[in-house]
């Protein structure tokens, strides 16, 4: 293996990952081909044999054995040498492995895949740094206080009390990865409570970076930084959603929702509340309780730590409690029935809350996938929002007529008529 062969290997891995997706997040992943799967373990061994860098491969055997056990059970269940872990086969595979249920199976698979993928990222990071040192030591370009860009990565040059979120925001906004070394520096970072305004604003910039958020978030998550910032995240990390609508685990879905919400920030008066609401809208999942109600309870201490006002916390609780309202109402109720519009009016206090809820509904639907968010469903939601806006402005739903006792008596005898003019 020469250097050019390693470059070929990297390109091959990137192409395969693009085709098969992430083993850690997909609900029906390919155990062998997906990112974080068995072929990535073989690639890590090949990199190690090359000798260009040293990789800790001791724990790879345990990870590989765990994935091979899953694959062996899968082949036994499906009677074929197919490596895609289909939804309808997961319960049987879990039973064969003597696990509690398919949720435990998929959570274990996700955790293993994330570890493999992280080790792969570390390996390529070491390789790229070695190549840089073998030629010349570049100087970092300063982009913010104690933050620079070196070799197309954002790096932390020195530690200060709030540097972690500032570095995450800068990486997300620049569309660059945050270096693995920098992520590891932040493992024990703690902000004062409530968070300073600078940290809160950088959090919004971080999660508002669109598609760039994905790899920065994952690098921080693998280093343990995300759970240090948000301990509540651990309950949904790698948590599977075993239904035909969702594509991703709960945590990955919430990150994807924030990514989709970033494209909608210009449609709302408070982009910060939209982004934070999107990132935590399913934080209540993982128990038998109503996840919307539980999530509304969990967001309160999170938002207090972040430093939001009482009014903003109330808005975030509203968004999480009612994040399914518009989609469920639009698809299950008659939009021509005034009672349908009144149902929304009774729960949504004003136009500002409605626009935030509408944007969150769109982001949630797009992040879930086409099976859950079709053009038809989007049109229904848009129509419901349009009618509700008109009602809020007093142009659609008239107040319910109040009848006198005499009129009620006539109505009971079918003798009451009303003429509108």
Short names for language-model regions:
Residues 3-6, 10, 260-263, 420:
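Extended hydrophobic/Leu-rich segments
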Residues 198-277, 286-292, 297-298, 304:
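Long, K/E/R/D-enriched contiguous segments that form extended
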Residues 38, 275, 415:
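Broad gene-expression machinery/nucleic-acid interaction feature
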Residues 55-56, 77, 95, 249, ...:
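Divalent metal-dependent catalytic cores for phosphoryl transfer on phosphate-bearing substrates
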Residues 1-244:
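Non-catalytic interface/linker regions that flank or bridge core catalytic/transmembrane domains
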Residues 66-67, 92, 96-99, 103, ...:
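Regulatory modules associated with amino-acid/nitrogen control
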């Amino acid at each position: 293996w020469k250097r050019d062969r390693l470059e070929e290997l990297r390109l091959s891995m990137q192409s395969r990952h693009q085709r098969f997706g992430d083993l850690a997040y997909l609900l029906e992943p390919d155990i062998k081909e997906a990112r974080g799967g068995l072929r990535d373990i073989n690639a890590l061994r090949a990199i190690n044999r090359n000798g260009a860098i040293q990789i800790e491969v001791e724990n790879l055997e345990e990870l590989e054995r765990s994935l091979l056990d899953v694959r062996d059970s899968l082949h036994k269940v499906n009677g074929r040498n197919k490596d895609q872990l289909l939804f309808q086969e997961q319960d049987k595979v879990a039973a064969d492995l003597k696990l509690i249920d398919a949720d435990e199976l998929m959570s274990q698979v996700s955790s293993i895949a994330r570890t493999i993928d992280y080790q792969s990222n570390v390996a390529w990071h070491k390789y790229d740094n070695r190549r840089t040192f073998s030629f010349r030591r570049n100087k970092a370009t300063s982009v913010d206080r104690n933050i620079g860009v070196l070799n197309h990565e954002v790096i932390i040059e020195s530690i200060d009390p709030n540097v972690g979120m500032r570095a995450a925001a800068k990486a997300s906004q620049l569309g660059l990865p945050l270096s693995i070394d920098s992520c590891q520096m932040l493992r024990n970072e703690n902000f004062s409570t409530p968070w300073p305004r600078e940290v809160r604003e950088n959090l919004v910039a971080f999660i508002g970076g669109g598609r760039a958020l994905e790899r920065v978030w994952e690098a921080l998550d693998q280093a343990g930084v995300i759970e240090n910032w948000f301990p509540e995240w651990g309950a949904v990390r790698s948590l599977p959603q075993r239904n035909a609508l969702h594509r991703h685990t709960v945590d990955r879905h919430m990150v994807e929702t924030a990514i989709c919400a970033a494209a909608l920030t210009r449609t709302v008066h408070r982009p910060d509340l939209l982004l934070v609401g999107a990132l935590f809208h399913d934080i209540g999942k993982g128990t038998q309780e109503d996840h919307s109600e539980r999530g509304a309870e969990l967001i309160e201490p999170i938002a207090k730590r972040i430093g939001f006002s009482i009014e903003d916390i109330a808005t975030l609780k509203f968004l999480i409690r009612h994040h399914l309202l518009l989609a469920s109402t639009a698809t299950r109720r008659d939009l021509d029935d005034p009672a349908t519009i009144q149902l929304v009016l009774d729960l949504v206090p004003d136009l500002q809350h409605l626009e935030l809820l509408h944007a969150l509904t769109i982001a949630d639907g797009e992040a879930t996938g086409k099976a859950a968010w079709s053009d038809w469903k989007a049109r229904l939601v848009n129509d419901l929002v349009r009618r509700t806006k008109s009602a809020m402005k007093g142009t659609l739903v008239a107040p319910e007529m109040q009848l006198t006792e005499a009129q009620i008596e006539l109505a009971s005898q079918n003798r009451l008529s009303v003429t509108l003019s």
